[in-house]
A protein has these predicted regions:
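Mid-domain alpha/beta scaffold segments of enzyme catalytic cores
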Residues: 1-277
């Protein structure tokens, strides 16, 4: 498979990389400089807890091309919400999101969503997600969505609480019909390491069936390693490898994959690039 270092002629965007995680503390600055040299022109760092937001704002202000989003991930609800009093805390969460999202480097709301894989409270998860959707609607920002084993529930909420700017279904895994439903609601599909595994037939078929305009690339680093890199820290410099896998899967030129997915991301997140307007 083509490596990232060989793809200097193309520009890329990683729409989902947890670059603030401690996994990158030892080499973050050098790694970002290396990524920029190989053509990664922008990255979106999704927030998972409010405690992260100030640090993410500082990080993005200090480095060109880094952007972030603010959100409360369904797997981290317990870090912010009281199990008994959470209903009374929703307005505080909404206020915190509204305030934090005013930062110029904040380009989306999320990572938020539904996760029925974990032992969580679905009512609580739906209420928190609805809070995020309402904030995104008010601020006219896109949403970065997390979903595991809850697509029917998520689609129901997206239909009842529409978001004009749409967003991304991060790490999409599902059928072509499911993908089309999200795309019809204005949500792009996040394409990452999953497509590098031949056993992921359903997802690979879905990604092949959608128009390229519906797709954005992501690594989800340091998680979601590509095939052949299991057990290693995933890294944003593997975005070109994701792009190469997508080109092979769709039998399309790599240049078209890079150009269109980058354009999709720049337009969706309004990343202030002239060619995205």
């Amino acid at each position: 498979m083509t490596t990232g270092i060989e793809q200097q002629d193309f520009n890329w965007v990683d729409t989902h990389c947890h670059f603030d995680f401690e996994d990158f503390d030892e080499d973050r600055e050098a790694l970002w400089q290396s990524c920029q040299r190989m053509g990664l022109e922008a990255m979106v760092i999704p927030g998972v807890t409010p405690d992260q937001w100030p640090r993410m704002a500082q990080m993005c202000a200090a480095a060109e091309g880094l952007h972030y989003s603010v959100g409360l991930h369904p797997c981290w609800l317990h870090t912010y919400l009281d199990p008994k009093l959470w209903r009374t805390q929703l307005q505080g969460l909404a206020d915190a999101l509204l305030q934090a999202a005013k930062d110029s480097h904040c380009v989306a709301i999320g990572e938020c969503g539904l996760d029925l894989y974990i032992d969580g409270d679905l009512e609580q998860q739906e209420a928190v997600l609805t809070c995020h959707l309402q904030v995104a609607r008010e601020l006219e920002q896109p949403v970065i969505l997390h979903c595991r084993r809850a697509h029917n529930e998520l689609l129901r909420l997206l239909k009842s609480h529409p978001v004009p700017r749409g967003g991304v279904v991060h790490a999409f895994s599902g059928s072509a019909e499911l993908a089309r439903q999200y795309w019809s609601l204005g949500f792009h599909l996040g394409v990452g390491g999953t497509i590098t595994y031949e056993r992921a037939n359903k997802t690979r078929n879905a990604i092949s069936a959608l128009p390229l305009e519906a797709l954005v690339l992501e690594t989800d680093a340091p998680d979601m390693p590509l095939c052949g890199h299991q057990g290693q820290r995933n890294s944003p410099d593997r975005i070109p490898q994701v792009g190469a896998a997508l080109a092979q899967l769709r039998a399309e030129p790599l240049e078209r994959i890079a150009t269109q997915t980058t354009r999709n991301a720049l337009q969706l997140f309004r990343l202030n690039h002239d060619d995205a307007r």
